[in-house]
């Protein structure tokens, strides 16, 4: 049944309305994320959320954030919801505050690691988890006018109020998470990416006594993620080495992920964080079934090294919501993604870059060793390369496996590697690219096969 009108916000957007991807609704602000779309998203999220009560909205530093928040607020209040706006904050602050305050849900306005011109909307339910697939589908159907909901009855307009002071609760949780551990005098560099981490990242480390150097430490929506942060580690590596720091941490735009470097500038990705933190929990007998949860992107060297420690690595599809679901189902204590999303059952089961950074730093010094020495105890990663092939046709990108030339090339490559490597090809859920990943024991094989498969994909998926 096609919906004729969505009073009080006007007609549905039809089939042109974008849907939820790997991490919410995301796209170019003003073109994909229009005020009209954000108004409708706010209204239908307000209707679809099951619990009664207010809804939280946080944002990163993007210039378009104020527009998106204003339109979402208009939609939510039109649905009768009170709205508490948090202002600039890390994404993990939203689910934490949902659970602490007992509100109906929350939204985070951010496009994470995407360029400044993009923006996005992440939606969380009453439990602080990302909105379920069935609820996302319900919102999408309402946006497109493919379904209808019962009338609300008498119109009630909600009230919006600024609530930036609530972020103090999140800051307190960061400090409480490390118990009595300290970082007094430890030289540390932070790359705050001009984004959400500027709201509390430096404060968290200073409160622990660290001797801090801060890069890109002010909110700047025109420079968020530009040649900095967790997707561009070179500035952090240079600063750590030049200043003789013990370690450094870089965050993405909304601070839900983190990558680290040691005092020698070596990169510590999410796989290494899981291995090192997981080893501590294993020794403390605080890791049920010796299980870690990661995604299909995690390195084969990580998996085999963890198995040698008697552990089990459970793999999920890409996306921290899949890691979250697997951890809940299995009772796992720790999980995450190679990209730096780390979820701890003891700390709210939400990817939190700042919390992960303070945990890694304080756990390291609680053992009386440097991060470099600790990294030496980690696994030896297999050479791995990821190439993004731009494919603008969404149908071809999503259904890439129908391309015989590409699947034949993959099969041939897999046969040549045997059990000593892996190939993963998938359509990105956040960008118009096909991701081609190859890992093997020999780096020359990785380079050759990645280049070959990317060329095949480029040739056969971008035909006129």
UniProtKB/Swiss-Prot annotation:
Cofactor needs: Mg(2+)
GO molecular function: magnesium ion binding; phosphoglucosamine mutase activity; phosphomannomutase activity
SUPFAM superfamilies: Phosphoglucomutase, C-terminal domain, Phosphoglucomutase, first 3 domains
BP GO terms, sorted: carbohydrate metabolic process; peptidoglycan biosynthetic process; UDP-N-acetylglucosamine biosynthetic process
Catalyses which reaction(s): alpha-D-glucosamine 1-phosphate = D-glucosamine 6-phosphate
Family: Belongs to the phosphohexose mutase family.
Protein name per UniProt: Phosphoglucosamine mutase
Organism in which the protein naturally occurs: Synechococcus sp. (strain CC9605)
Species classification: Bacteria, Bacillati, Cyanobacteriota, Cyanophyceae, Synechococcales
Name of the encoding gene: glmM
